[in-house]
């Protein structure tokens, strides 16, 4: 029996699930017909509190797969916790994560192992996933995967545009060389991904503060990238996402909450742009916005706004208590900013270079933040004042009143000196 072997597997495939027994059965069925010897990989099903026949489905594969099962109480949508629980139970040096409903090709395990083999450094492998388009699932997909096994489905429609991995245009643009991407972490989607277990735990695994649908995988990708762990794409370790019911509006709402968590945990421009672009449309181009902010930074370099900041500070009423002031578009180019007594300054600018000198100051009353002001990590009404300078003119042409709206969210007073005629 596959489950009785003492041979250490080469790969652990972790599948989180919740009340989708039929879909899980289909995913496990494709893993049971891999070309790789069954003793060389194991499957770990991590149950997020199912009340259907999920446990019975897992038991039905005990004579066909090396399979483990872990259950956690249903305390709401906790897929990050479920994946971590599955990873803790895994015994292989490599982890793969598949979503319930992903139908793996027969050489999936073999291809994952091949992608991680050789003298190349340990890396994250993004496996392709055909058919995934939560915005607009294609009507032919259901009948296709019902009628044919995965490899035959790919043979029949593998070149059809509607069947492609949604990320294909992004991958093609860099000839599948993710080292040419500024933000490869944006495409770290755990419907099909693999990485060394040591690297997974080195960065802390999934952040279990992320509950609800969406974003927890991209945030992990962000941390992996920040730790210098390279990412690559494998077109060979593919799967097909079987169509299933989705609560799209609820998912989008949940995703935005998690994007907000992302910004609070990693307060810098790129997570901020991820929040802003996702808020406009779930699969917008963050890279396009990054390049636009680079251009605006180039145009504004050398622009001094110290007089505008002084005008804004003059609007503060006298106070015996410390007052917090944030500046959107602080610039400064390293010139000194000396806040008045009892004022704590938070200097925000989308050009990280102009903040460098301020960061070297030994001044507890001044802190620098590589943020534009589209979405900040602070709670509502955290500041007494936000000053928006003319360095924001370029971004405001594209983003309109978004900066003013965010300023009013976090502060009781907002001043834009360049619009006052002072």
Swiss-Prot record:
<dbReference type="InterPro" id="IPR027791">
    <property type="entry name" value="Galactosyl_T_C"/>
</dbReference>
<keyword id="KW-0464">Manganese</keyword>
<comment type="similarity">
    <text>Belongs to the glycosyltransferase 2 family.</text>
</comment>
<dbReference type="InterPro" id="IPR050834">
    <property type="entry name" value="Glycosyltransf_2"/>
</dbReference>
<dbReference type="GO" id="GO:0017000">
    <property type="term" value="P:antibiotic biosynthetic process"/>
</dbReference>
<keyword id="KW-0808">Transferase</keyword>
<protein>
    <recommendedName>
        <fullName>Validoxylamine A glucosyltransferase</fullName>
        <ecNumber>2.4.1.338</ecNumber>
    </recommendedName>
</protein>
<dbReference type="Pfam" id="PF00535">
    <property type="entry name" value="Glycos_transf_2"/>
</dbReference>
<keyword id="KW-0479">Metal-binding</keyword>
<dbReference type="InterPro" id="IPR029044">
    <property type="entry name" value="Nucleotide-diphossugar_trans"/>
</dbReference>
<dbReference type="GO" id="GO:0046872">
    <property type="term" value="F:metal ion binding"/>
</dbReference>
<comment type="function">
    <text>Involved in the biosynthesis of the antifungal agent validamycin A. Catalyzes the final attachment of glucose from UDP-alpha-D-glucose to validoxylamine A to yield validamycin A. UDP-glucose is the most efficient glycosyl donor, whereas GDP-glucose and ADP-glucose are much less efficient. ValG also utilizes UDP-galactose as substrate to produce the new validamycin analog, 4''-epi-validamycin A.</text>
</comment>
<keyword id="KW-0045">Antibiotic biosynthesis</keyword>
<dbReference type="GO" id="GO:0016740">
    <property type="term" value="F:transferase activity"/>
</dbReference>
<dbReference type="InterPro" id="IPR001173">
    <property type="entry name" value="Glyco_trans_2-like"/>
</dbReference>
<dbReference type="Pfam" id="PF02709">
    <property type="entry name" value="Glyco_transf_7C"/>
</dbReference>
């Amino acid at each position: 029996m596959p489950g009785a072997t003492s041979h250490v597997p080469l790969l652990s495939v972790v599948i989180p699930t919740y009340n989708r027994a039929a879909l899980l059965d289909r995913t496990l069925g494709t893993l049971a017909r891999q070309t790789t010897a069954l003793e060389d990989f194991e499957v770990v099903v991590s149950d997020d509190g199912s009340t259907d026949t999920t446990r019975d489905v897992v038991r039905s594969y005990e004579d066909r797969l090396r399979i483990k099962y872990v259950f956690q109480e249903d305390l709401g949508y906790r897929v990050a916790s479920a994946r971590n629980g599955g990873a803790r139970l895994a015994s292989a040096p490599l982890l793969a994560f598949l979503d319930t409903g992903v139908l793996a090709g027969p050489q999936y395990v073999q291809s994952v192992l091949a992608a991680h083999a050789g003298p190349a450094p340990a890396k994250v492998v993004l496996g392709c996933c055909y058919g995934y388009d939560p915005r607009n699932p294609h009507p032919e997909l259901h009948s296709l995967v019902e009628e044919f096994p995965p490899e035959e489905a790919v043979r029949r429609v593998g070149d059809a545009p509607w069947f492609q991995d949604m990320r294909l245009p992004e991958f093609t643009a860099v000839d599948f060389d993710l080292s040419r991407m500024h933000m490869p972490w944006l495409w770290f989607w755990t419907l099909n991904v693999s990485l060394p277990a040591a690297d997974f735990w080195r960065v802390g695994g999934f952040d279990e503060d992320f509950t609800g649908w969406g974003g927890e995988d991209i945030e992990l990708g962000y941390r992996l990238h920040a730790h210098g762990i390279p990412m690559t794409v494998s077109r060979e370790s593919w799967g097909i996402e079987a169509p299933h019911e989705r609560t799209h509006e609820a998912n989008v709402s949940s995703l935005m909450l998690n994007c907000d968590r992302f910004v609070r945990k990693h307060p810098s421009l790129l997570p901020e742009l991820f929040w802003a672009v996702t808020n406009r449309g779930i699969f917008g181009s963050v890279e396009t916005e990054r390049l636009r902010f680079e251009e605006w930074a180039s145009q504004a370099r050398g622009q001094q706004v110290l007089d505008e900041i002084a005008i804004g500070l003059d609007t503060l009423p006298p106070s015996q208590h410390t007052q917090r002031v944030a500046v959107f578009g602080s610039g400064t180019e390293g010139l000194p900013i000396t806040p008045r007594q009892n004022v704590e300054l938070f200097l925000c600018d989308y050009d990280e270079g102009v903040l460098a000198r301020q960061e070297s100051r030994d001044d507890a009353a001044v802190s620098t933040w590589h943020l534009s002001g589209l979405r900040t990590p602070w709670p509502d009404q955290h500041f007494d004042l936000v000053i928006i300078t003319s360095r924001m003119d370029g971004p405001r042409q594209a983003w309109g009143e978004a900066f003013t709206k965010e300023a009013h969210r976090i502060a009781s007073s907002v001043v834009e000196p360049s619009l006052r005629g002072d």
